[in-house]
Amino acid sequence: MNYLYNISESLKKIFNYFSSITRDCEKKRVLIIGCGFGGSQVAKLLDSNFEVTVVERKQTFFNSIASIRAIVEPELAKKIYIPYDKLLKNGKFIYGTVIEISPTLVKLEDGKELTFDYLVIATGSNSLAPFKAPLEKISGTEIFNYYKDISEQIKQAKSILIVGGGSVGCEVVGEIINKYPIKNKELAKKITIVHSGNKLVSSKTNNKFNNLINESMKKRNVSVILNDRIEIPDDIKQCFINQTSPNFQVSLKTYKTKNGLSIESDFVIWTIGIKLNSESYKTNFSNEINEIGQIKVNQSCQVQGYDNIFAIGDITDFDELKTTYNALSHGNIVAKVIKDLSNGKNKNQLAKHKLLPPIISLSLGPKDGLTQINSNLNFGSFISRILKSNNLLINRFQTHFNNPEPLK
């Protein structure tokens, strides 16, 4: 009997040993909410070694950088909406709307509940500008027609008001004037920018960059009004709250500025900033967000108070420009940190996102642009064309998503 007992105990030990190996070999579950620039980077980097699940409302990635050109070159539309179907070899996508994110699970609109070992919140932001087709436009034809309609309105317009003179507003000017140059009197547009700040593009640009962008606008006969603002109509405010598209139609109106100026325009583009997609996390993480809804994170992109929950992109409270470059950097950091945590690395040894001096590359049409690297290096059209203006990173992100078939 002792002999049989010893065999039984030995078999139990062998079973427990192999069970522990199996548990150790099980892939950790990484749940990523949102698949923009940063979210897609995390998903791609962790796909081989983790059980990756991405939750997305849309079935295509939206290349917002290139979208400003699509409003005058609608044939680009099918290239800036990139299907996700080739991004992951092992992981999976769940297409749906997240209604609640908590420290232990994520709830979807259809009732599904998802758990995780590591959570990456990459919900991003939206804007009022006409560069993004409404969610219900899902086929290539529908998306093309959306941009074609806007391009026709811009073609008809004689005077265009750009409300907001940040980088997006200035890039829009570059695209419109490249398409309708001032020397073509029949098609040329009278363009006015109204900007609430004291200089165009960003408060982080140096004096040389500021002088160059002012000269560029002057050369293009663009009227620039600084330190003033247009009162946003109620219907536009509602669109901003609901994240729906305003009615982009040519219609001659007079707009009053806060300082009392009257501006006549028949087409308006609102580039007044972004709205964070914070609804899903703001309830359960109310102590971890700041007054504008950004999530408080440490240098490893971990949400304040949590080792296994991360935030990246526009929704972080990093004191930096919200750029594609920084979103991709966040993605790289989070992927490395998750790998290190799963390997038992000490939290003091984790990778950290470095807050770098601003890198600003401004496209002003396919052949022109301005670039500032760090706080003291400025470059003109040649470098800007290489970095951004020529292709607006269309090829870069087609490759990033493994060159899927275009939308049909």
From Swiss-Prot:
EC code(s) of this entry: 1.-.-.-
UniProt cross-references to Pfam families, sorted A to Z: Pyr_redox_2 (PF07992)
Keyword Oxidoreductase (UniProt): yes
SUPFAM superfamilies (alphabetical): FAD/NAD(P)-binding domain
Domain of life of the native organism: Eukaryota
GO molecular function, one term: flavin adenine dinucleotide binding
Residues annotated to bind FAD: G34, C35, G36, F37, G38, R69, D314
Tagged with keyword DNA-binding: no
Identification of the protein by name: Apoptosis-inducing factor homolog A
Gene: aifA
